Every structure is written in C-alpha cells, then in structure tokens.
UniProtKB/Swiss-Prot annotation:
Pfam families the record matches: NTP_transf_3
Family under the similarity heading: Belongs to the MobA family.
Physiological role: Transfers a GMP moiety from GTP to Mo-molybdopterin (Mo-MPT) cofactor (Moco or molybdenum cofactor) to form Mo-molybdopterin guanine dinucleotide (Mo-MGD) cofactor.
Top-level taxon of the source organism: Bacteria
Documented EC number(s): 2.7.7.77
The protein's assembly and partners: Monomer.
Upper classification of the organism: Bacteria, Pseudomonadati, Pseudomonadota, Betaproteobacteria, Burkholderiales
Residues noted as binding GTP in the record, renumbered to the chain: 12-14, 25, 53, 71, 101
Organism: Polynucleobacter asymbioticus (strain DSM 18221 / CIP 109841 / QLW-P1DMWA-1)
Gene from which the chain derives: mobA
Cofactor(s) this protein cannot do without: Mg(2+)
Localization terms from the record: Cytoplasm
Protein name: Molybdenum cofactor guanylyltransferase
Amino acid sequence: MISPENITGLILAGGRAQRMGGIDKGLISFHQKPLIESAINRLKNQVGPILINANRNITKYAGYGYPVVMDETPDFSGPLAGFSVGLKACKTSYLLTSPCDSPLLPLDLAARLAAEMERGPFDLVYASSLESGKTWAQPVFCLMRANLQDSLTAFLTKGDLKIDRWFKELKSSTVIFDDAQAFANVNTPEELKILEAAL
C-alpha cells in the first residue's frame, strides 16, 4: 500500500494565466481566501511533503511554509515544466500533481490514484471525469513515480510540451471520478464567479 507519507504533493501555480488578464491565479481570492490556500487545505491530508511550483510572487508563496520550486525553462512553459522541477525536488517515491486553481479537488484523489498505481505496474495514473456520459482526461491531476525525471527531461529536450504526448510514452492508467465539478478550474473572471456561486 502506498502511504500518504510516501507521496509528495506538487501544487502547480506557475502559469501565465492569460485568460485572467495575467493575474497570478494562485493568489486570486476565492471566498475571501487565495486559491492556493484551498489547494493546500485539500491536499495536505492526502500527502506527506508539499511543494509549490511558482514563477512569480515567490515570497508570498513561500510564506505558506512550503518549498517553492521555479520552472527551469523560460516563458511559462506549461505543466510539464512544473512536473520536471517537482520531480527533481521530490524526496519520496511518488509525486502527486494538482493545479492551484481547482478549489474542489477530490479529498480522495491521492488514495484513488494510488490504489490504481498498485494495480499496475504503471509509471503514472491520472484522473478523468465523467460528464454528460463522456470521459474527460484531467492530466494535471496525476500520480507519478519519482523516477520519471530522466524520461521527462528527454521529452522536454525535444522541445515538446504536450502533456498527453509524454503520457503516451509511458505505462499509464486513469481513474474516473463521477463528480466533474471536482476538477472545475478558474480560467476567467466569469468562471470564478460561477464557481463561487455554486458553493
């Protein structure tokens, strides 16, 4: 059994947030608290150590008491850049990734992905959601083995940043969650208002 202590949680807060006007999404207020706080609170009982991947406002993020890791690639290169620095900093056997702007992320995310990982062997297991009879991949909600650093470095060296293409190079599986809203994220001011009103 994979224990929570053997999983490092990586909260991805390093994006450019163009659709939010370039505002740092992790620091946007959601019910009077920054989104990063919701991510920490929903993740902290599921994992051991926590890392925050951020590329600006480093001091503010560091104020939450967790190590902050910055992308090593320029120009906000996407979630794989965050995965890469997270894997390098990870001291446990597994890394669980989650974006900072999904304040309803499942409280059993780690447990369910870990159960599927043990059913493997798999390199990584990601979440999917069921909505209107369709299954939608949620690849940034992902549990991966910490030994994937070399694979990811080689992939990024080719100049590819597409998360689904890296997954195809690996032994992967998915876990389907019935509550699609659990993965709802905030990309625009309108989505923020809708999500706040739903709670």
